[in-house]
From Swiss-Prot:
It catalyses: 3'-dephospho-CoA + ATP = ADP + CoA + H(+). Keywords: ATP-binding, Coenzyme A biosynthesis, Cytoplasm, Kinase, Nucleotide-binding, Transferase. Its main location: cytoplasm. Pathway: Cofactor biosynthesis; coenzyme A biosynthesis; CoA from (R)-pantothenate: step 5/5. It comes from Aeromonas hydrophila. This is Dephospho-CoA kinase. HAMAP family: Dephospho_CoA_kinase. The gene is coaE. GO terms for molecular function: ATP binding; dephospho-CoA kinase activity. PANTHER family: BIFUNCTIONAL COENZYME A SYNTHASE-RELATED, DEPHOSPHO-COA KINASE-RELATED. Residues 3-200 form the DPCK domain. CDD domains: DPCK. Belongs to the CoaE family.
Amino acid sequence: MYVVAITGGIGSGKTTIANQFAELGIDVVDADVIAREVVEPGAPALAAIAAHFGPDVIAADGQLDRRSLRERVFSDPDAKVWLNALLHPLIRQEMFGRCAAAHSPYCLLVVPLLVENKLTGLANRVLVIDVDEATQIERTCRRDGVSREQVQAILAAQASRAERLAAADDVLDNKNGAPETIKPRILALHETYMAFASQQASQV
């Protein structure tokens, strides 16, 4: 399966762009969705997290209390290492499986922290959704109802714009964000990826 990874910083519009590829019939695998699924009630990973951190990280309804876990991990680097060692292999395995099971000519793999977690090798091609920092801050504040300072803290913890662009095979400028502006570029990329996927399939 030919895999195109799509990444970008917070507020860049990754989900919106991925949805437009989905409308073209392309299977989309989202790392964030998988990350939530592997810690659902009944999942072995959730039991391991509860055993390691204690019952405080489990909410009354049996779901993972993400805020409580975030606070524990934020203040304890060793805890973050342990958690990543547990979850990242599970998420990666599930991403591989879903990409392999895709039925479209190529698969779109949405990984927000592709560069940060050094996962560019998972894909045949990397598409970076690029916007400037001011746009990221404005969109995220409006979408999530958070302060500029909170968004800036998230940005500081993510790869820089330059680091993401250095990892890109293709770049989609999404500063405007208007569908009519983006659609022609998406269609052009789609045709390119279809051709690459066809070429790969013919070599198998």
